[in-house]
Each structure stands twice: as C-alpha cells, then as structure tokens.
Design a protein with these regions (language model features):
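Short beta-strand element of the alpha/beta-hydrolase
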Residues: 58-67
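N-terminal cap/lid segment of alpha/beta-hydrolase-fold proteins
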Residues: 1-56, 105, 177
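The feature captures the conserved acid-bearing segment of alpha/beta-hydrolase catalytic domains
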Residues: 158-165, 171-177, 192-232, 236, ...
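Short beta-strand-to-loop junctions in surface cap/lid or active-site-entrance loops
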Residues: 46-57, 117, 124-126, 201-205
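Catalytic nucleophile-loop/oxyanion-hole region of alpha/beta-hydrolase
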Residues: 73-77, 95-130, 260-265
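C-terminal catalytic histidine-bearing segment of alpha/beta-hydrolase fold enzymes
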Residues: 232-235, 239-281
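Primarily recognizes the serine-hydrolase "nucleophile elbow" in alpha/beta-hydrolase
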Residues: 114-184, 191-196
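Short amphipathic alpha-helix adjacent to the substrate-entry channel of hydrolases
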Residues: 75-93
Length: 281
C-alpha cells in the first residue's frame, strides 16, 4: 500500500528503476546462494533493490522499511526513500529482510550484515564509496538499525564496518509487551535474547554512530508501546553518551508516513542527508 505521503516519490523511483533496468543495470540481487537457500529456504526472501547514483563514487545507504510481521513496506518506505536520497546524490539499496516466523535466530540482522558485506565486496560494480555508509530505518526497521549500530550486538558481531550514520524515522526503541509474542512466534525453542528483545537506548555507547532521529507527537504506534520510553528515551540516551545527533519532533507526523509529504515531517530526508554529510566531513 502506498498513500499520498509517498505516492509521487514512489512512482518516480519505480520509473527510474525501470529506466536503469532497461539500460542494462541489474536492480534486484538475492543475498544468499542456492546452496544457502537450500539449507534454509527462508533466505530466498532476502533481497536487495539497487537504486544507482548518477555519479560514481557516491556514498550509499541501506533502507530498512518497517513491517507488521506479515507485511513489509518496501514500496512506501523503500522505493520512495531511495528516490529522495537519489535526488541528494546517493546510491541506495532497499533491503527486503526476513520477517514474521522467518525472522527467528536474528535472521534480520544476518540479512542486514550480508547486505552490507555484499555491497562492500562489490563496491566497484555498484560505483559506490565504502566510507561512511548510512542505515536508514523506519519503525521496526529503525529498531534493527539501532541494534546494528551497537558494536557487540550489531556490526562488530557480524564483522562488517561500522555505519557512518544512522537515520531513524519513528523507530521502535522498546517492543515491551510484544517481546513474549515475538519469542513465541520466532524463537520458541531458544532461550537466548534476540534482536526484538533489545532496547535500543540501552545499546547506545559513546562510540555509537552519529544519529538523526525523528518521531511525531501524534504517533499512535509509539503511544501503544509507551510513548515516553520510545523516541524521547532514545534521544536522551544519545545526548547522555555524547553521540553526535539531531533530533526532530513533529506535531503532525503519524506512524508509517514514510517520507512524510504533506505532514510536518516533509523534507526530513533532505535534512537527514545534510546531517549525514556534516558528520562525514
């Protein structure tokens, strides 16, 4: 589903992808080999969608859309955001990661690490810089990006370079009552903590990546998960740890609005790109 807050950018992004595909550029990449998929069939659902930059040597971002266990927002969050960042001069990869019952044993973190490694290993093919890459996450995708920003739980654990910046749009900081349900759905036979059990603000350390964070005061999803312990708590943790950050809070910016056209969050992607540039200098 694509609503009015993302429709125009989504259409522009799809048209651009169709054009580059027509010009001979591959835009869809599986993340796992046939042998790896045979060993774990759910890996077939992990893919990268590539939106090339106009100029070689551009920095790249990986976009993690939100999901509702059975639906992920590659169109609303992925393609529209890819187009907005493309307009700012970046290369963008929208990640389709495993969700729902396929997301057990930290599968989404594995997918993200595999995506980063794949882009890094093929940087010449994609024409991208390997320095200061961004993770841009919406909602539960923002929670994934936030966990991955921690060295022990994320990038260091998987042996990939540290993100240059996190760009988090209405991220879930703490899943609260949903954690037992997620455990029953995804990891019934496991005792270890998994990605959904972590509170992002508790993973913020002084060496955490610079972070652009925004959320809305009228976000009902964040209110369902105890609003003060979501964005506000994450913002305090960033400040307390001395992490370079920019936090924007809007009166009219509901959950799931993506790039936010027609809301108080409109043009947030441009401001996030400016922040990214400022912390990369």
């Amino acid at each position: 589903m694509v609503d009015d807050t993302s429709a125009e950018a989504c259409a522009a992004g799809l048209n651009y992808l169709a054009q580059v595909y027509h010009d001979g550029v591959q835009v869809t990449y599986p993340l796992y080999s046939e042998e790896e998929i045979a060993a774990m069939p759910s890996r077939a659902h992990a893919e990268l969608y590539y939106c090339p930059a106009e100029q070689p040597g551009a920095k790249f971002a990986i976009v993690l859309s939100g999901n509702s266990l059975y639906y992920s927002g590659e169109l609303r969050g992925g393609v529209s955001t890819a187009w907005e960042l493309h307009e700012q001069g970046y290369a963008v990869f929208s990640l389709r990661y495993r969700i729902g019952w396929e997301a057990g044993d930290d599968a989404p973190l594995e997918d993200l690490a595999r995506a980063i490694r794949f882009v890094m290993d093929n940087a010449d093919t994609f024409g991208v810089s390997t320095e200061d890459y961004a993770l841009l996450g919406y909602s539960s995708g923002g929670q994934l990006a936030g966990v991955f920003g921690n060295e022990e739980k994320g990038w260091g654990r998987y042996g990939v370079p540290k993100p240059g910046v996190l760009l988090l749009a209405y991220p879930i900081n703490n899943f609260f009552e949903a954690k037992p349900a997620y455990h029953l759905l995804m990891d019934t036979d496991r005792l270890e903590r998994r990605y959904y059990s972590y509170t992002v603000s508790k993973l913020v350390t002084p060496d955490y990546p610079p972070t652009f964070l925004w959320y809305g005061r009228n976000d009902l999803m964040l209110k369902a998960f105890v609003y003060p312990l979501q964005g506000p708590t994450l913002a305090k943790a960033l400040e307390a740890s001395g992490v370079p950050n920019r936090v924007e809070v809007y009166d009219n910016a509901k959950h799931g609005i993506g790039i936010g056209v027609g809301t108080d969050a409109e043009d947030w992607v441009e401001r996030a790109a400016e922040f990214w540039q400022s912390v990369s200098e």
